[in-house]
């Protein structure tokens, strides 16, 4: 959920913003997803856990590995703490926040994180293209845990589902001639 905020700037203009608001059930679910993934190191096992425990999305659907990965990689859940600051700096993220704002309490807001094109699936941009600020919302996942999960996901990238590669395809062919 989000809450509308407005303030008056020095030059008298009204600045409007949105503040993310916590929804207790969703916060608990996000914590569970991170916890299970950190324990198992597997998107499939996390998916299986959520299925067995009847955890569903806010639209009432079953989670997919893709959706779980989306939650695990979304920095909005990360607490803006020392570890988060170091990680973002090391990854050359464009920070629009002072070091002091990484107070161990608030969450991260990341902009320009995805490339969205009509008719195409959204793509995650390289971190160097992100624009990151400290939000007004409370963070949920400690920076160290979020960073650890990113490292675990990087290790698992080679196992990620893409298009199946079959050894049979090059051997099969269609012949329209009647030659024998």
Give, region by region, the residue ranges found by the protein language model:
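Conserved catalytic breakage-reunion loop centered on the nucleophilic residue
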Residues: 1-180
């Amino acid at each position: 959920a989000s809450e509308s905020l407005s303030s008056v700037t020095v030059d008298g203009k009204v600045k409007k913003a949105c503040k993310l608001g916590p929804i207790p059930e969703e916060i608990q679910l996000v914590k569970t997803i991170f916890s299970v993934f950190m324990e198992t190191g597997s998107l499939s096992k996390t998916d299986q856990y959520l299925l067995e425990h009847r955890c569903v999305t806010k639209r009432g659907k079953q989670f997919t590995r893709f959706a779980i990965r989306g939650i695990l990689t979304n920095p909005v859940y990360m607490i803006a703490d020392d570890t988060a600051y170091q990680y973002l700096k090391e990854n050359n993220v464009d920070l629009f926040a002072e070091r002091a704002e990484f107070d161990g309490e608030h969450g991260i807001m990341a902009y320009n994180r995805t490339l969205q094109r009509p008719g195409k699936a959204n793509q995650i941009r390289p971190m160097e293209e992100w624009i990151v600020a400290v939000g007004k919302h409370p963070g949920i996942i400690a920076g160290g845990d979020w960073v650890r999960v990113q490292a675990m996901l990087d290790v698992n990238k080679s196992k990620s589902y893409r298009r199946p590669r079959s050894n049979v395809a090059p051997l099969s062919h269609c012949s329209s001639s009647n030659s024998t």
